[in-house]
């Protein structure tokens, strides 16, 4: 990727990651780009612990509509969330579990407020499987152990960022789309970030940062 296009968000991987961590600490979203040879997409990511209905509404409005809750394997086991399919043959092995809905406190489950309630229910310290109904309107994703050092995906990036910011290891993500419904690529993501004031970093930035600091 041409790094100069990302210079408004930091001249080095370290700067971009630190800016993103700081944004997360303040409960703000960040935009994460993956490799151009992979999905070549940008996801808007919020810490699950602090996401608001207003932020969820932005994900729904500007994203693909598939809002995902990225969580650890340990959390998936705590909630008894099996994989969506027995044999995952998707290109990037995206680890969807069955979809979820909060058992209490929601109406249809599809509104921004309802999806936030579902997320808050799922990441509660004392959450148990019966706190959730299946299926639902939130799509959990199981992050690979080791984060982006194991798998260079948006799922792992969101969990890593949450951990580095001092939050529970859970992030809420959605792919950003253009007004015509096509996927937003790097130039589109940069313009989107400038318009709304988001930090931008790449998954490779996060890999480089973690390796440099052994974290």
UniProtKB/Swiss-Prot annotation:
Binds 2 divalent metal cations per subunit. Magnesium or manganese. One of its GO terms (molecular function) is magnesium ion binding. Its cofactor is Mg(2+); Mn(2+). SUPFAM superfamilies: YrdC/RibB. The record marks 137, 175 as: Essential for catalytic activity. Pathway: Cofactor biosynthesis; riboflavin biosynthesis; 2-hydroxy-3-oxobutyl phosphate from D-ribulose 5-phosphate: step 1/1. Keywords: Lyase, Magnesium, Manganese, Metal-binding, Riboflavin biosynthesis. D-ribulose 5-phosphate binds at residues 38-39, 43, 151-155, 175. InterPro entries: DHBP_synth_RibB-like_a/b_dom, DHBP_synthase_RibB. One of its GO terms (biological process) is riboflavin biosynthetic process. Mg(2+) 1 binds at residue 39. The keyword Magnesium applies. Mg(2+) 2 binds at residues 39, 154. It holds the Pfam family DHBP_synthase. Its EC number is 4.1.99.12. It catalyses: D-ribulose 5-phosphate = (2S)-2-hydroxy-3-oxobutyl phosphate + formate + H(+). Catalyzes the conversion of D-ribulose 5-phosphate to formate and 3,4-dihydroxy-2-butanone 4-phosphate. Homodimer. PANTHER family: 3,4-DIHYDROXY-2-BUTANONE 4-PHOSPHATE SYNTHASE (PTHR21327:SF38), GTP CYCLOHYDROLASE II-RELATED (PTHR21327). Belongs to the DHBP synthase family. This is 3,4-dihydroxy-2-butanone 4-phosphate synthase.
């Amino acid at each position: 990727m041409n790094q100069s296009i990302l210079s408004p968000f930091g001249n080095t991987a370290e700067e971009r990651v630190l800016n993103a961590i700081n944004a997360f600490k303040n409960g703000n979203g960040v935009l994460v780009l993956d490799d151009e040879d992979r999905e070549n997409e940008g996801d808007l990511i919020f810490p699950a612990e602090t996401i608001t209905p207003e932020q969820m509404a932005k994900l729904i409005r500007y994203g693909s509509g598939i809002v995902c809750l990225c969580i650890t394997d340990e959390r998936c086991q705590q909630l008894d969330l099996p994989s969506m399919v027995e044999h995952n043959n998707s290109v990037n092995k995206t680890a969807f579990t069955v979809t979820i809905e909060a058992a209490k406190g929601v109406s249809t489950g599809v509104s921004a407020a309802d999806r936030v309630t579902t997320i808050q229910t799922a990441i509660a310290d004392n959450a148990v499987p019966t706190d959730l109904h299946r299926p639902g309107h939130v799509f959990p994703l199981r992050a690979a152990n080791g984060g982006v050092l194991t798998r260079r995906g948006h799922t792992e990036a969101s969990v890593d960022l949450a951990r580095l910011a001092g939050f529970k290891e859970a992030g809420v993500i959605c792919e950003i789309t253009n007004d015509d419904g096509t996927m937003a690529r790097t130039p589109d993501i940069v313009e989107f970030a400038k318009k709304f004031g988001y930090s931008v970093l790449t998954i490779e930035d996060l890999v480089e940062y973690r390796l440099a600091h052994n974290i």
